[in-house]
């Protein structure tokens, strides 16, 4: 029995015509978009096409859960509704707001991106892949997400969840490039925003990593796996193997330091104690050095300060 979903790339193997495959793709997209139109989650960044708002949401959503991002996103845009507004503030102000989201390097990158957007792009978020990926911290995934969700351009946005879903649809393990090629090929050219948001919600709510709800899937007719046999998503495109434990990690220690600095300067001699690394001074020194290199903290007269005084 042939797979329920094939791509033009796979047609080279199966011998099916491109017209047959295009028919299947259009039927799949109709089913997905009809489902998405009725069931999409109500998330604040889905109510706007403002490129700056979309960029902020995508940076915040990197490795951070939706429920933690939502209040920070709303507060961020209330304070800094444009790149120009953020450039009038300080990195330390942004880092204070960022508390609770984790991975503060993203805040530094967003701060630097705002300055580049103002200085190089006249205050307008770029609308090409080539220009977007020149922004600090913006890679191909984030750039594609901005192009789709702000400018409604026909790109596929491949993240961990979507990579898992596409592998199951096609019934095969996918490398990163092939996964992205398939996402770009399958995207509905007339409704790229709705199609990609539908994929996100389908993958996040039904096509789960464990215990997928195959019987409730609105497009199960086109799925090659449907929960039977080995999961083709294992080790496939964009499918993560999970983060290292947070407890006892460098991330936790760095977070303690940055949280303390939101309340004011800290004597450098107290850094190890604040990070709960009194027994590992070498590690504490390395982490402080890393934070300085990333311009997240400044050392001045034997005191640590939040942000970069040279910003």
Identify the residue ranges that each predicted region occupies.
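Catalytic cores of DNA base-excision repair glycosylases
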Residues: 22-24, 30-252, 260, 265-267, ...
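Short amphipathic alpha-helical interaction segments
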Residues: 278-292
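A short, conserved structural fragment
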Residues: 292-304
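N-terminal amphipathic/basic-hydrophobic helices that include classical n-h-c signal peptides
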Residues: 1-12
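Residues in the recognition helix of alpha-helical DNA-binding motifs
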Residues: 146, 287-290, 305-307
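N-terminal export signals and maturation junctions of secreted/periplasmic proteins
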Residues: 13-23
């Amino acid at each position: 029995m042939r797979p329920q979903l094939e791509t033009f790339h796979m047609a080279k193997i199966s011998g099916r015509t491109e017209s047959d495959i295009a028919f299947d793709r259009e039927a799949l997209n109709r089913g997905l978009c009809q489902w998405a139109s009725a069931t999409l989650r109500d998330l604040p960044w889905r109510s706007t096409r403002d490129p700056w708002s979309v960029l902020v949401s995508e940076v915040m959503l990197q490795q951070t859960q939706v429920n933690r991002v939502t209040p920070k996103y709303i507060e961020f845009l209330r304070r800094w509704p444009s790149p120009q507004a953020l450039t009038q503030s300080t990195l330390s102000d942004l880092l204070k707001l960022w508390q609770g989201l984790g991975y503060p390097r993203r805040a530094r990158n967003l701060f630097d991106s705002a300055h580049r957007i103002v200085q190089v792009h006249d205050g307008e978020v770029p609308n090409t892949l080539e220009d977007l990926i020149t922004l600090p911290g913006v890679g191909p995934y984030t750039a594609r997400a901005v192009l789709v969700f702000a400018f409604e351009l026909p790109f596929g946005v491949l993240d961990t969840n979507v990579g898992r879903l596409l592998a199951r649809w096609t019934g095969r393990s996918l490398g990163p490039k092939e996964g992205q090629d398939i996402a770009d090929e399958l995207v509905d050219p007339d409704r790229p925003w709705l199609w990609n948001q539908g994929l996100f919600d389908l993958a996040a709510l039904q096509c789960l990593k464990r215990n997928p709800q195959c019987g409730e899937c609105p497009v199960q007719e086109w799925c090659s796996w449907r929960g039977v046999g080995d999961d083709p998503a294992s080790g496939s495109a964009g499918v993560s193997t999970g983060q290292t434990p947070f407890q006892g990690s460098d991330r936790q220690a760095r977070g303690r330091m940055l949280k303390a600095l939101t309340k004011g300067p800290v004597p450098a001699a107290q850094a190890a104690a604040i990070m709960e690394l009194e027994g590992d001074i070498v590690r504490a020194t390395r982490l402080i050095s890393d934070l300085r290199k990333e311009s997240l903290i400044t050392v001045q007269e034997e005191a640590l300060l939040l942000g970069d005084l040279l910003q």
